[in-house]
């Protein structure tokens, strides 16, 4: 049950804590493979880790970094056929037994493929619950374990097609306690079979805006299906509430030394998203042929090809996702 854990880190003081939290809280520690693209001023001392042989590590000077998707692409390049793929951010904490919990949930969903091929390639994803840093030096954190309900992802009502094909996403808490279907992905929490890395390789040409939406549509049209689960066994440190300073890729101090500035990368990213939905990108970085954008419109209420909102409630509220029996194909609703 090997798990390939992909982490792209940018100047993040919590990277080491994230690695240890994943390792220490796993039931099958020896089955973990960490793949890390560490964009920082000073590299980690990987040789000091007791599980050094389970870490595939690349250090990149921040001045040479080209953004989060570029870094995630590099982290994926160390994949060597592991059974499962987990992508997280470098400021994440885990519950005990998280590896078994994720696998059991995925297998439960996959079991439904006997009735419908829609369930053959599931992806579990979410915007995880938050955690707080109580004492950074002592490694003390407070995990938001109180709300164990399923949290879903929808489009933000105030940001639909705000920049060409791009619309912002938002996590929405529910009072639901079972698996639900999903139609969007969160880059900071993806758990699926390892073949995802080969079928949907990260496109390094995206920057920040466009990352999650492009990946979701590439995966969906290649036959992958998305699901949310209750009580997701990992937690995320959100920058808007964090008391731990952390640079972002577009930090002026770092960006001033780069040949290509972050705003140029962002523009190219948004243009590429337009090209994706216009089906102007071919090969593994383009859309697949197993499902269409019309199929996606049926499950999401969004017509990406024509930049139209077909059903505002379906696209921006949790009602639709929690109303569908997760064991039924939502495209055939």
Regions found by a protein language model. Name each.
Residues 2-301:
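Catalytic cores of eukaryotic secretory-pathway lumenal/extracellular enzymes that build
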Residues 279-333:
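Non-catalytic, C-terminal membrane-associated alpha-helical segments of glycosyltransferases
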């Amino acid at each position: 049950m090997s798990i390939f854990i992909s982490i792209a880190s940018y100047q993040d003081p919590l990277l080491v804590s994230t690695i240890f939290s994943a390792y220490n809280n796993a039931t099958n520690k020896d089955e973990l493979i960490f793949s890390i693209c560490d964009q920082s001023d000073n590299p980690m001392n990987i040789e000091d880790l007791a599980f050094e042989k389970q870490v595939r590590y690349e250090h990149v000077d921040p001045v040479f970094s080209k953004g989060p998707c570029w870094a995630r692409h590099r982290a994926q390049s160390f994949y060597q056929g592991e059974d499962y793929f987990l992508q997280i951010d470098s400021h994440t904490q885990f519950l005990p037994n998280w590896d078994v919990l994720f696998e059991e949930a995925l297998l439960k969903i996959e079991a439904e493929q006997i009735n419908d091929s829609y369930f053959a390639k599931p992806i579990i994803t979410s915007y995880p619950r938050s955690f707080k840093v109580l004492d950074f030096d002592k490694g003390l954190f407070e995990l938001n374990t109180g709300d164990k309900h399923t949290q879903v992802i929808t489009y933000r009502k105030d940001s639909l097609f705000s920049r060409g094909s791009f619309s912002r996403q938002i996590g929405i808490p529910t009072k639901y306690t079972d698996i639900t279907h999903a139609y969007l992905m969160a880059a900071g929490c993806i758990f699926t079979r390892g073949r995802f890395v080969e079928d949907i390789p990260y496109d390094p040409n995206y920057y920040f805006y466009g990352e999650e939406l492009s990946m979701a549509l590439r995966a969906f049209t290649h036959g992958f299906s998305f699901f949310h689960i209750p009580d997701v066994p990992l937690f995320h440190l959100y920058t808007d509430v964090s008391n731990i300073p952390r640079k972002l890729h577009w930090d002026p101090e770092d960006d001033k030394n780069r040949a290509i500035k972050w705003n140029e990368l962002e523009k190219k990213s948004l243009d590429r998203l337009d090209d994706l939905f216009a089906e102007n990108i071919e090969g593994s970085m383009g859309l697949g042929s197993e499902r269409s954008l019309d199929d996606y419109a049926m499950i999401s209420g969004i017509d990406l090809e024509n930049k139209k909102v077909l059903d505002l409630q379906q696209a921006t509220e949790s009602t639709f996702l929690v109303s569908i029996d997760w064991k039924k194909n939502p495209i055939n609703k």
